Amino acid sequence: FKKEIKFQNYVIFFSVIFYITIFTFVLPSLKYLFPSKIISDELKKLNYEELSVTGYHEPSLVFLAKGKIILSDPNEAAIFLAEGNNNLVLVEGRELDEFINSSSNLNLKLKKIREIKGFNYSKGQNIKILFFKVAK
């Protein structure tokens, strides 16, 4: 009976160590699984006045952007870019063609600033987010 309890204590001890290791070191290092965090980190490096995003409307991104973000469709994002002096638009890859067409209709010259890739685990799909400003 004592050996059984001793074995259970070892199992519990090593399970705790395993979970602490996984949740403290392994999961946070898998940046690909946290695209909103990647986006937030990239935004800190950029100079812009206002921000809009189309196609990637995740609550985590709104939270990390402290609510200073406009969720839009591709046409609204192009208009937003045209109306601002130093605005930034984030476009999810599946919305890119529509965004480019809308921008073209407004005679906007786009400059791609960044591109990040990640996995949107809430929807179970790979994503690509492109950062755009108006070319000067």
What are these regions (language model features)?
Residues 1-136:
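Membrane-embedded architecture of ER/inner-membrane glycosylation machinery
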